Each structure stands twice: as structure tokens, then as C-alpha cells.
Regions:
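Short, small-residue-biased leader/transition segments that mark boundaries at the very start
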Residues: 1-3
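Acidic/histidine-rich alpha-helical segments that form the ligand environment
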Residues: 6-27, 73-104, 109-128
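Short, contiguous alpha-helical
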Residues: 31-79, 104-148
């Protein structure tokens, strides 16, 4: 499989993941309900409601793309902003070089890493959102596009 095909496959998964995350979020009857009390870690407040989980997951769009020097935003829904981020990325003729860049906190980042991270990050927060939602609303009232 050539580099472009691998990129397109991972991009397709990252966009599907964003669509699935949005579908899960939109299916939750009360986006401000929580199944557990608020708590904090050394990272800060843990997202407890569907709205908090959604906003957190959507808003990393700018962070992940910035780690590979791509201008992006988190305006609109998670799918729309991620799609625009890929469009911005693809406007650079050398985007498939998979250049490794030193990102914030001294961490190495590449296009492949960003693609994998989108999928991983969506999944961990979708699982938390789904678990919270079925506790509060029941599995029959929430979609499960990730097949948890």
C-alpha cells in the first residue's frame, strides 16, 4: 500500500470516528446530565457530562493539527472542524512527507501520529460518554456507533 493510500485510509477512519462521535453525542437526551460527581486530576477537571466530553474531544482538533504545523480551528461540530483541518493540511504539497516535528512538551509528532491520535482520543472519550449515557438514560435510548 502506497503512502497516499495509507493516509487516505487513516483519514477516512478519523473522519468516520468524528461522525460517529457526533452521532453518539447527538443521541444523548440531556447533554448536561452526569452519572458521577465532579472530580479533578493533575490535568484539571475531568469531563463528566456529554457536553463536557464532546467539547473537550472537539477542541483538541486545533492542538493535534498544530503539533504538525497545520492551521485548524474547532468551529462548528467535530466532523466539520476535523474535515477543514484535513483540507488545510492537504493544501501543503509536501503533506505526505510525514515530517517528524518537535511539538509542545518536547514530544515528537508526525502526520501518522496525529491520525492515530484522533482515532484513539475519540474512542476513549466516546467510551466514557457511552458508559455515562447508558447509566443515566439506558442503552435503548442512546446510539452505539462504536459498538461498545
Amino acid at each position: 500500500m502506497c503512502i497516499r493510500d495509507r493516509y487516505e485510509a487513516l483519514k477516512t477512519l478519523a473522519l468516520k470516528s468524528a461522525k460517529d462521535f457526533l452521532a453518539l453525542y447527538e443521541s444523548i437526551p440531556d447533554k448536561n446530565a452526569a452519572a458521577a460527581p465532579e472530580r479533578k486530576t493533575f490535568y484539571g477537571k475531568v469531563p463528566c457530562t456529554a457536553n463536557e466530553m464532546y467539547e473537550h474531544t472537539k477542541n483538541v482538533n486545533t492542538y493535534y493539527f498544530a503539533e504538525i504545523a497545520v492551521e485548524a480551528d474547532h468551529d462548528g461540530n467535530i466532523y466539520e472542524c476535523r474535515k477543514r483541518g484535513f483540507e488545510s493540511l492537504e493544501s501543503n504539497p509536501d503533506f505526505l512527507q510525514n515530517t517528524v516535528r518537535k511539538g509542545s512538551y518536547g514530544e515528537d509528532w508526525s502526520l501518522r501520529k496525529v491520525l492515530r491520535r484522533f482515532i484513539w482520543h475519540d474512542r476513549i472519550h466516546a467510551k466514557a460518554m457511552y458508559r455515562m449515557a447508558i447509566k443515566v438514560f439506558g442503552a435503548e435510548n442512546v446510539v452505539n456507533p462504536f459498538y461498545f
